[in-house]
C-alpha cells in the first residue's frame, strides 16, 4: 500500500513539474509563403496544413498575398481545427499569428524609400512577462552573394564574369535597404530593452549565412 501511495505521489509530482515546465516555454515558427503559395498546386490548403502540423504559439509569415483577406481566412480555417489565433498584417506582405492575446500591434521600422518593408510588431504578455515579437522581410534587391557566382544580385541574370573583389561585393550589397531597416529595428527595440521585454524577430532577412562565403 505504501509503495502504491509513493508511486502515485511521484506521478503527481511529475505531472505538476511537466505542467509547470510547459508554462515556461512557447514555440515560434517562421514561414515564407513564396508568392503566397500561388505558384504551388493547392498551396492555400498546404499553408493551413503546415500551420496546423507545426501548431506554433507564434507564427511569423512573409510573402503574404492580400493580407486583409488572407489572415482572417487562415484564422478561420485553423479555428475549425481547434486552434485559436489572433493575427495582423497592416496590409503588408508580412504578418504575425499568435495564440497569445496581443497587448498591442504596431507597424514600425519604416524606412524612407522602402516603406513597403516595414515590420509588424506584437507585444504579448506570456505568464506575466511581456514579450515583443517582430515580423520582417528585408529588401530582396542587391542580394550580392550571387556576384562571386557570376550572377547579378538584383536581376539574377548571368554576368560576363564572376566578381570576387570583397570591397566591390560589399559596396553593391549596401545599395539595398537591409542595413537601414536593421538600424531602424535596433532603434525601435531600445524601448523594449528599457522596459525589460525579451525580443524575438523572425522573417526573411535576404542575407546569406556566413557559410555561403566559404571557398567551396
PLM feature spans:
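Active-site flanking residues adjacent to catalytic metal/cofactor-binding acidic residues
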Residues: 31, 62, 136, 202-204
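N-terminal, active-site-proximal structural segment of metallo-dependent hydrolase catalytic domains
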Residues: 2-3, 18-80
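Sec-dependent N-terminal signal peptides
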Residues: 4-14
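Structured beta-strand-rich core segments of catalytic domains in phosphoester-bond hydrolases
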Residues: 62-152
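Metal-dependent phosphoesterases centered on the DNase I-like endonuclease/exonuclease/phosphatase
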Residues: 150-216
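Short coil/turn segments at beta-strand junctions that form active-site/ligand-binding loops
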Residues: 25, 129-130, 195-198
Amino acid at each position: 500500500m505504501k509503495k502504491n501511495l509513493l508511486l502515485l505521489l511521484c506521478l503527481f509530482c511529475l505531472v505538476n513539474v511537466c505542467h509547470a515546465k510547459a508554462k515556461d516555454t512557447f514555440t515560434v515558427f517562421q514561414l515564407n509563403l513564396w508568392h503566397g503559395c500561388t505558384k504551388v498546386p493547392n498551396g492555400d490548403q498546404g499553408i493551413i496544413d503546415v500551420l496546423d502540423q507545426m501548431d506554433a504559439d507564434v507564427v511569423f509569415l512573409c510573402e503574404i498575398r492580400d493580407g486583409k483577406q488572407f489572415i482572417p481566412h487562415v484564422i478561420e480555417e485553423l479555428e475549425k481545427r481547434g486552434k485559436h489565433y489572433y493575427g495582423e498584417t497592416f496590409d503588408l506582405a508580412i504578418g504575425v499569428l499568435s495564440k497569445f492575446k496581443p497587448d498591442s500591434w504596431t507597424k514600425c521600422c519604416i524606412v524612407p524609400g522602402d516603406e513597403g518593408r516595414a515590420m509588424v510588431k506584437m507585444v504579448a504578455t506570456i505568464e506575466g512577462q511581456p514579450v515583443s515579437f517582430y515580423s520582417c522581410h528585408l529588401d530582396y534587391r542587391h542580394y550580392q552573394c550571387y556576384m562571386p557566382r557570376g550572377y547579378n544580385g538584383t536581376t539574377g541574370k548571368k554576368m560576363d564574369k564572376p566578381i570576387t573583389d570583397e570591397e566591390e561585393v560589399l559596396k553593391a550589397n549596401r545599395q539595398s535597404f537591409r542595413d537601414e531597416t536593421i538600424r531602424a529595428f535596433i532603434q525601435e527595440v531600445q524601448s523594449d530593452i528599457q522596459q525589460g521585454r525579451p525580443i524575438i524577430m523572425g522573417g526573411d532577412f535576404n542575407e546569406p549565412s556566413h557559410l555561403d562565403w566559404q571557398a567551396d
